[in-house]
Amino acid sequence: MTSRKRSPHDFIFKEELGHGSYSTVFKALDKKSPNKIYAIKVCSKKHIIKEAKVKYVTIEKNTMNLLAQKHHAGIIKLYYTFHDEENLYFVLDFAPGGELLSLLHKMGTFNDIWTRHFTAQLIDALEFIHSHGIIHRDLKPENVLLDRDGRLMITDFGAAATIDPSLSGDSAKFNSDSNGSKDNQNCASFVGTAEYVSPELLLYNQCGYGSDIWALGCMIYQFVQGQPPFRGENELKTFEKIVALDYPWGPNNRINNSTSPINPLVINLVQKILVIEVNERISLEQIKRHPYFSKVDWNDKIKIWRGIWQSQGQSLQQTTLGLPNIPQNILPTRQLHVIDTPARSIQITKQKRKKPTKISNTTSSIVVWRKRLGISTGKDDLGTVPSTTPAVTAPNDTNVLTNTAAHSTANIALPPNSQSNQVKRAQLVAPNRIPPKVPVINDNVRNKSIPRTKPNVPPLQTSSIPQKLSTSSASSALSAPSTEIRNQDLTHTLDGRNSIDIHVLKQDYVFIYGIPYEHEGPAMSLNSYNKIDNDLITSLVAQHKEELKNSESFLQVLTLKKSGMLSYKNTVMEGNDDQENKEHQMANIEDTDLSMYDFEFNELTRKGFLILEKYKNRIWFISLPSYSTLSKIPFNAVKSSTINNNENWVDCFFRARQLLEEKQILDKISNVSFDSKASSEPSSPPPISRKERPLSIGNNVTTLSYTAKNGSQNNAPQNDNVGEEKPFRIPSSTKDRPGANSTPSSRHPRVLSSNNAGETPKKMNGRLPNSAPSTNTYTNGSVPAFNHRPSTNVGNNKHNILTSKKQGSSVFSPSSSTTKPQIKTTGYRQPTPSPPLPQMEFPTTREKYSAPSNMVISSSRYEVLHTLNNSQTNFDREIASRGASAAFRSLQKSKKKK
């Protein structure tokens, strides 16, 4: 290290090399020595502080400064560090060979010579790191670079820990619960990548030198097999495989070495490294004495650190040019990154581009969307960092989308006003289940509805209208303006022969190529498949791109509905109507066996593939036709067949999931809210029927009140008219109120004085026989609540009482044709409130479950609500206190209970 002060002005910044969790790496030239090439890591101060990355930057700087004191060929060297007002700068070795993972993806697997040579270099480098009291804690092929000659160089020490107390306190963490093993000082913080995490970190929340050796064993296996040994459908499954040693070479599996012979010595070496107990895991010194390295002279450092291209007389350029032109940034499917978060606001970066082949941080990758992860819940439970960041925070966030160029800011999955949009969507799916809709109806609405209603409406019309029709009519009376405008806008874009389906989220022309699953067939071909991974998909696309595009046959119209159902129709370009009218069901977004992959999918450039996989059933390669192909289709046909072409397909898939989750939450809320659906079901004792209620008018009866939790009925003395109240009617009788003789008799629709006795049969004959009132019934002064069902249920009566207490009794309006002006009635009731109302405790319960009208409750919020309010909860707060180990045990515990 030199003490001369440097600054960004001393360097010429070239192209961007990669993107890390909190930094961007550039190729740079020294202005004073142009022949010197460096890699400069630029860290945004604003982002570091915002994302709480100061700790990791300090760790990396201190660790690399310590290692740079004695330069080692296998360690990236730190030359200078400096900063300006906006950024921190790390001047590092330039590695023109790229990442080791990129080379592995190109080669598929390494032969025995390369495997032994790379492993020997890793062992020597790890021995040097451990000799300085440093644990890397995130060793994986992505964090190993290659120089021009093919030598390995370990990088990315942001997760490192040290047992040297001379370093920063954040860099070293000591565990007092040491078991006295050979790595007797361990770190107790959760870092690393899911597929390389050691079992002691999961089981005991400890990490030592043996954790790096475990990661080395995983890498040796990956060199030979092409993929890590432990790979689950999600992080929890991966962790379970790790602690169970569930991998092809594990003790419980029979090794099939006939198809592709593997050196048995390397199998034996991996089996001795991948051991659960740290005390039984072989050390680096024992690995060096293993028979697999019998021909390696560990004292001959020159031979060990000879580059692979150097030893074979090949240059880096010859090797890379000789490889097939396959995208090298393709990620292994289901490989999930645990610790990294995409950088977002580094000022010096002009064009955001993900770090090549970085897990969850690449633009040319297959991004896994396994529905069973839940996108947020599955990862949050494990303490993973990337999933806690919403996809809307930046258009280049690869947790949702991998190709940033394909999605402009106008097409982000959740726009800033997404909350209001979510409310509208939820109302469209189930408009009768949202409690906040009730208080919208105020006195003005009720007062205006009475004069418009004529008293002599024929009651026979109500009996001739079916229940289903009357309910929908009542619903449209409240929400018709917004619905009609929306339908007019949508139908205006369609052909006159077609009518739009409001349940369709998106519909457009695509190419679809389906490949069925066959257990005995090839791994992956155009005709069948029995295995899926990134290498197979990459090879298939590279060799059969035109066939998958299917551009010479016909187009399909792909339809995604709000119910989550995905289907398509064939649209033959020649005009064959037989295939066009047949609908083919593909899958439902809610299907737990459905996965979605993004292979360079870009809707703007119409390139790449959106891949859907139904587990052991079929794979669909979905691509978009070019604009020239679309121009051959008649304009009217395009207009009539495309819906919502302003929103991209990936966003619509996530929106469909969101709508389904919202519907599930609405179903949960409906079980605890006071809507008519929950209370319309019979329970014991049964509520008083409509036909029996007129007989009890004027008598004191005991009504049934529902508990807020499960809807059970309790006998409680209440006002005699509460059980028979229409929605938003006055819950009292003129006979029971003080001073009732001077009160207008129409205050209760069913309690009439002798002046109105003649109209009683006329009005009741029209209402009593029916289970659902018609539109005419509602316009007679009775505005429906919730789902506009009849008012015989107790749930609506309870809500009426809630509204009267919160807004005052003046919100209720009479509906009798002989009613005096509403102002008089309201003015008279104020000095004489109903006596039973102050005794009711329902408003407290309603506050517990209701939500503001502009907020949609997510499933996690709903569960937290009930967890915090449930005194008998089974959630163990002590277990899920810190780290991956705690999260793993907590999830294991919850899984056993299920």
UniProtKB/Swiss-Prot annotation:
GO biological process entries: cell integrity MAPK cascade; intracellular signal transduction
Domain Protein kinase span(s) in chain numbering: 11-293
Gene3D superfamilies, alphabetized: Phosphorylase Kinase, domain 1, Transferase(Phosphotransferase) domain 1
InterPro entries: Kinase-like_dom_sf, PDPK1, Prot_kinase_dom, Protein_kinase_ATP_BS, Ser/Thr_kinase_AS, Ser_Thr_kinase_AGC
UniProt binding sites for ATP: 17-25, 41
Biological function: Serine/threonine-protein kinase which may phosphorylate the same targets substrates as PKH1 and PKH2, 2 upstream activators of PKC1.
Protein name per the record: Serine/threonine-protein kinase PKH3
Organism from which the protein derives: Saccharomyces cerevisiae (strain ATCC 204508 / S288c)
Gene: PKH3
